[in-house]
């Protein structure tokens, strides 16, 4: 019993310190534009979307066009079921404006494979064992294939 408690305590400590992700440093004006492009509104609790308060979890160039892109995550089992998370991908345009290009429920994993214009394929993770992989076709992200741990699978 003592070993189990010690192990759990150690894991809790490691997950909150060593492996903690740092939030991206985004200028306030830029963050405001990103949230607004995704349809979020500023409230006293933060930036709220149709489900819950969101946070920018990724802020970098995702497709190699030298412009920043952002991923906003929000969390709600009421909206997103067992997965509990949704995401919104916002891309900076050449004009400097931001545009929502994709949103979905699930946990996005950006893969090395790419669609049109250098946009990475997105594995849409969550509970289960076979996940949709979305590919950018120049207009939108659409389901391209299904895979689990890098191998093809089917939903049958």
Where are these regions (language model features)?
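Beta-propeller blade termini
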Residues: 52-64, 106-121
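Sec-dependent N-terminal signal peptides
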Residues: 4-14
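Short consensus segments that form the blades of beta-propeller domains
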Residues: 47-48, 77-82
